[in-house]
């Protein structure tokens, strides 16, 4: 199993990246919370990975922290949640925010994420409660530490903020008209794409 990669970031287009490790290029998909912590292209980076083997493909998922990867692994063990939906959930909110939703039984916020219906949200709240407790105990011994380690201070991003934001939202499962409308409504002069995506997502939750 590939558990971690360190190499040069060759390409990045949310939610996918390409890392060159000693001449071998690895394609990964990442939640936006991790994606926007990456350095600029042609700089070295390190990501924790989760490897998925399917009949028709072999896929790598990347994460900036072990905590986010651990939460991803718990999510895909939930009935009805596959890697794609888990990635969408972790792109729509930080790991810490997800923990908060589970703690509060906040089904209203969860169902606003693309692909998360009422039944799926209910399963997440029920099945993740005990799993999260074990995860937090294993990672740091407290919810507070887990939440602190799972939230990021976003790095500056690229130009064409509106185009990048719309593309990222579509990749998460939002319909193009909805993505475009939300991005346009949230945009303010000088916003970078990461800030704009967060603002657009917040307006839809």
UniProtKB/Swiss-Prot annotation:
Q: Which Gene Ontology MF annotations are present? A: ATP binding; four-way junction DNA binding; four-way junction helicase activity
| Sequence segments annotated as region (Domain III) | 157-205
One Gene Ontology term, aspect cellular component? Holliday junction helicase complex
Annotated region Flexible linker: where?
Answer: 144-156
Xref: InterPro entries: DNA_helicase_Holl-junc_RuvA_I (IPR013849), Hlx-hairpin-Hlx_DNA-bd_motif (IPR003583), NA-bd_OB-fold (IPR012340), RuvA (IPR000085), RuvA_2-like (IPR010994), RuvA_C (IPR011114), RuvA_C_sf (IPR036267)
Query: One Pfam family for this entry, by name?
Result: RuvA_C
The entry's localization annotation reads: Cytoplasm
User: A biological process (GO) annotation for this entry?
Assistant: DNA repair
Gene3D superfamilies, per database record: 5' to 3' exonuclease, C-terminal subdomain (1.10.150.20), DNA helicase RuvA subunit, C-terminal domain (1.10.8.10), Nucleic acid-binding proteins (2.40.50.140)
Which key words tag this protein in UniProt? Cytoplasm, DNA damage, DNA recombination, DNA repair, DNA-binding
According to the UniProt record, where is the region Domain II? Answer: 65-143
Database matches in SMART domains: HhH1 (SM00278)
Q: What is its main location?
A: cytoplasm
The subunit field of the Swiss-Prot or TrEMBL record says:
Homotetramer. Forms an RuvA(8)-RuvB(12)-Holliday junction (HJ) complex. HJ DNA is sandwiched between 2 RuvA tetramers; dsDNA enters through RuvA and exits via RuvB. An RuvB hexamer assembles on each DNA strand where it exits the tetramer. Each RuvB hexamer is contacted by two RuvA subunits (via domain III) on 2 adjacent RuvB subunits; this complex drives branch migration. In the full resolvosome a probable DNA-RuvA(4)-RuvB(12)-RuvC(2) complex forms which resolves the HJ.
Write out the similarity annotation: Belongs to the RuvA family.
Instruction: Report the protein's function.
Output: The RuvA-RuvB-RuvC complex processes Holliday junction (HJ) DNA during genetic recombination and DNA repair, while the RuvA-RuvB complex plays an important role in the rescue of blocked DNA replication forks via replication fork reversal (RFR). RuvA specifically binds to HJ cruciform DNA, conferring on it an open structure. The RuvB hexamer acts as an ATP-dependent pump, pulling dsDNA into and through the RuvAB complex. HJ branch migration allows RuvC to scan DNA until it finds its consensus sequence, where it cleaves and resolves the cruciform DNA.
Q: What's the record's remark on domains?
A: Has three domains with a flexible linker between the domains II and III and assumes an 'L' shape. Domain III is highly mobile and contacts RuvB.
Q: Mind telling me what this protein is named?
A: Holliday junction branch migration complex subunit RuvA
Q: Which organism is it from?
A: Shewanella baltica (strain OS155 / ATCC BAA-1091)
